[in-house]
From Swiss-Prot:
UniProt-listed PANTHER family: ACETYL-COENZYME A CARBOXYLASE CARBOXYL TRANSFERASE SUBUNIT ALPHA (PTHR42853), ACETYL-COENZYME A CARBOXYLASE CARBOXYL TRANSFERASE SUBUNIT ALPHA, CHLOROPLASTIC (PTHR42853:SF3)
Primary location recorded for the protein, binned into one broad class: cytoplasm
Compartments (UniProt record): Cytoplasm
Protein name: Acetyl-coenzyme A carboxylase carboxyl transferase subunit alpha
Organism ancestry: Bacteria, Bacillati, Cyanobacteriota, Cyanophyceae, Nostocales
InterPro entries: Acetyl_CoA_COase_a_su (IPR001095), ClpP/crotonase-like_dom_sf (IPR029045), COA_CT_C (IPR011763)
Amino acid sequence: MATTERKPLLLDFEKPLAELATRIDQIRQLAEENGVDVSGQIRQLEARAMQLREEIFTSLSPSQRLQVARHPRRPSTLDYIQAISDEWMELHGDRCGGDDPALVGGIGRLSGQPVVMLGHQKGRDTKDNIARNFGMPYPGGYRKAMRLMEHANKFSMPILTFIDTPGAWSGVEAEHQGQGEAIAYNLREMFCLDVPIICTVIGEGGSGGALGIGVGDRLLMFEHSVYTVATPEACAAILWKDAGKAPQAAVALKIISHDLKRLGIIDQILPEPTGGAHSDPLKAATTLKQVLLENLDELNHLTAPERRQLRYEKFRKIGVFTEVAH
């Protein structure tokens, strides 16, 4: 995971923080030029900046959390794998002639335990994003994922999946290649695997593209990630014929972690560093590793039939509601 100092990419709601940071830098520069001690004032302003950052990030709207989830510097699947694994070897190919770079995976060790890790992979710049199709896999990506999961099942290795996609690619070519079948096959087969499966939404969890690697014993979610049946922009365009109503759609869709936990769709929320995972990737990775190990320890104490039954029951409960007569 890169640690080189780079100019921050600020989101719209972070502008007050940028203004305060500029003011601190100006005061510090003037003090150095004039030999004046303003350390007390600097400390007060820095404390105010920390407080303001905390206030902003604890009161984000769903559409603002979506901006954080889509941040260009948000840690990716490969970032997390490299940060949490003792060793790692990427495996390629779906054994049908393809190797989709939008979905990566391989074998590694997590605190000495052999595991298979796989997930969606977005690019870091325009060229990389085009090569990885902006993290939207073709059917071959899901077939590659299933091949790796079958490998994990054969050799009794837990499966860790990392979800970060706007959705599966919906182009004509993908449909010709059987996009719906590839995702449906994964859904069915993941329910039948004997090994522990832990799925983590690290950024965007979009539609069937997320579900294609999202059936597990545990569904974890980073605090500022989103998980949704459709992007708010698509939902607004469909329901109101106006993509500009995406913020209202984001509220209605219940895409944020706290709503999803309350609804029983996800199992655990992973706290992020103040400012989002991109503000301190190593801290976010440390949190992820700790939570994965805790959940693996619990799941390893269950038998394969117990895991399969609980996995099935978990998903059967999603969407259950009680009608109240008026």
